[in-house]
């Protein structure tokens, strides 16, 4: 499998989540020192992660805005330390071009933008400048749709075209339907059912639903975040079967066997 110029063995891969934030919904505050972050990265690599997704700002509903300066202070030391110690691809989870540039300079390989280049208008130019793969996620301000799956597909197609127009090569563009972002539980359910339509847009798809509210709903409600890993793994299997190629998860080990087996059947 290729992500731009990078090659990953197999037809599917796990992206392990590393939140260096105090307020992420699942593990906020757990990895706020470089050493704690490195220890977690080492475990995720041992468990089978092929990409580490580093985030310095929580994007959960109601989270506090973090300035680019503070975000850079959180992520750059961790990215540098990962690069110095491990041979692993790193993505930077940010929608701010200033943070993205600092992360790429520190050694990040991939841009993961939850606003698909809409925040400041410079992310696509940066991706083109660095020849960096970029993941474009569906997002919007309100949970209002004509038909959620079609609207998500239209958005992703339009943002991918905007990236192409800005000079990003097609093989550097990935898309993410954005489960849990500006979507009700029912809308997330509908999008899950229509996931194959997203996978038919002509771009590789990242699937990120780990521990989110819709997973809790599928389990009947009232579960804690870390109690959703088994259901997350089941949804990873579903997504890979629909055509997704990367699953973004908190618990790498719970997903590794699923990805290893299904990767050989894709």
Curated annotation (Swiss-Prot):
Keyword Transmembrane: no
Descriptive protein name: Dihydropteroate synthase
Coiled-coil regions listed: none
Catalytic activity: (7,8-dihydropterin-6-yl)methyl diphosphate + 4-aminobenzoate = 7,8-dihydropteroate + diphosphate
Enzyme class of the recorded protein, top EC level: transferase
Record Gene3D superfamilies: Dihydropteroate synthase-like (3.20.20.20)
Binding, (7,8-dihydropterin-6-yl)methyl diphosphate: 59, 93, 112, 176, 212, 248-250
Pathway assignment: Cofactor biosynthesis; tetrahydrofolate biosynthesis; 7,8-dihydrofolate from 2-amino-4-hydroxy-6-hydroxymethyl-7,8-dihydropteridine diphosphate and 4-aminobenzoate: step 1/2
Pterin-binding domain boundaries: 12-260
Gene that encodes it: folP
Family: Belongs to the DHPS family.
GO molecular function: dihydropteroate synthase activity; metal ion binding
InterPro entries on file: DHP_synth-like, DHP_synth_dom, Dihydropteroate_synth-like_sf, Pterin-binding_dom
Keywords: Folate biosynthesis, Magnesium, Metal-binding, Transferase
Record-listed E.C. numbers: 2.5.1.15
Subunit structure, as described in the record: Homodimer or homotrimer.
Function description: Catalyzes the condensation of para-aminobenzoate (pABA) with 6-hydroxymethyl-7,8-dihydropterin diphosphate (DHPt-PP) to form 7,8-dihydropteroate (H2Pte), the immediate precursor of folate derivatives.
One record GO biological process: folic acid biosynthetic process
């Amino acid at each position: 499998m290729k992500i731009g110029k990078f090659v990953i063995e197999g037809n599917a891969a796990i992206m392990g989540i590393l939140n260096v934030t105090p307020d992420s919904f699942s593990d906020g505050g757990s990895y706020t020192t470089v050493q704690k972050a490195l220890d977690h990265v080492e475990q995720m690599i041992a468990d089978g992660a092929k990409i580490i997704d580093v985030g310095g700002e929580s994007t959960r509903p109601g989270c506090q805005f973090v300035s680019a300066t503070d975000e850079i202070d959180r992520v750059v030391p961790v990215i540098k330390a990962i690069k110095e110690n491990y041979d692993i691809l790193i993505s930077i989870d940010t929608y701010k071009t200033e943070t993205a540039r600092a992360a790429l300079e520190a050694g990040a390989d991939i841009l993961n933008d939850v606003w698909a280049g809409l925040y400041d208008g410079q992310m696509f130019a940066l991706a083109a400048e660095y020849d960096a793969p970029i993941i474009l996620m569906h997002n919007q301000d309100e949970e209002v749709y004509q038909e959620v799956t079609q609207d998500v597909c239209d958005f992703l197609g339009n943002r991918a075209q905007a990236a192409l127009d800005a000079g990003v090569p097609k093989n550097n563009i990935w898309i993410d339907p954005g489960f849990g972002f500006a979507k009700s539980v029912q809308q997330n359910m509908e999008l899950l059912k229509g996931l194959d339509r997203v996978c038919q847009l002509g771009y590789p798809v990242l699937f990120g639903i780990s521990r989110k509210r819709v997973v809790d709903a599928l389990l009947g409600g009232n579960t804690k975040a870390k109690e959703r890993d088994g259901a997350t793994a089941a949804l990873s299997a579903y997504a890979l079967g629909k055509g997704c190629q990367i699953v973004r998860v908190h618990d790498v080990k719970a997903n590794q066997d699923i990805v290893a087996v299904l990767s050989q059947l894709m």
